[in-house]
Amino acid sequence: MDNNTKLQKLYEQLAATGSEKELDAMLDENMAGAGSPLTVTITGLIVAATTGFDWCPTGACTYSCRV
């Protein structure tokens, strides 16, 4: 599954927790860069809001977090 598909599934899971505008703002503000792996660009807020995924906060771009 590519990063865009993962992000779309995550977005769908979060759709019930906030408005589309709030989710768009949250995701836009927390992207570290287009070339970064998705698991490194999502912040801890999404970590707390999701299950089944091991997301790393932007500040925790470490080897153990990326693997």
UniProtKB/Swiss-Prot annotation:
Residue runs in coiled coils: none
Gene Ontology terms: biological process: defense response to bacterium; killing of cells of another organism
2,3-didehydrobutyrine modified-residue sites: T39, T43
Keyword Methyltransferase: no
Keywords: Antibiotic, Antimicrobial, Bacteriocin, Lantibiotic, Secreted, Thioether bond
Main subcellular location: secreted
Domain of life of the organism encoding this protein: Bacteria
Modification type 2,3-didehydroalanine (Ser): residues: S36
Gene Ontology cellular component terms for the protein in this record: extracellular region
Gene Ontology molecular functions: signaling receptor binding
Compartments, record wording: Secreted
PTM (free text): Contains DL-beta-methyllanthionine, when coepressed in E.coli with the flavecin synthetase FlvM2.
Propiece residues: 1-34
Function: Lanthionine-containing peptide antibiotic (lantibiotic) only active on Gram-positive bacteria in synergy with Flvalpha.a. Is not active in absence of Flvalpha.a, which is encoded by the same operon than Flvbeta.b. The bactericidal activity of lantibiotics is based on depolarization of energized bacterial cytoplasmic membranes, initiated by the formation of aqueous transmembrane pores.
UniProt name for this protein: Lantibiotic Flvbeta.b
Species this chain originates from: Ruminococcus flavefaciens
Lineage start: Bacteria, Bacillati, Bacillota, Clostridia, Eubacteriales
This protein's encoding gene: FlvA2.b
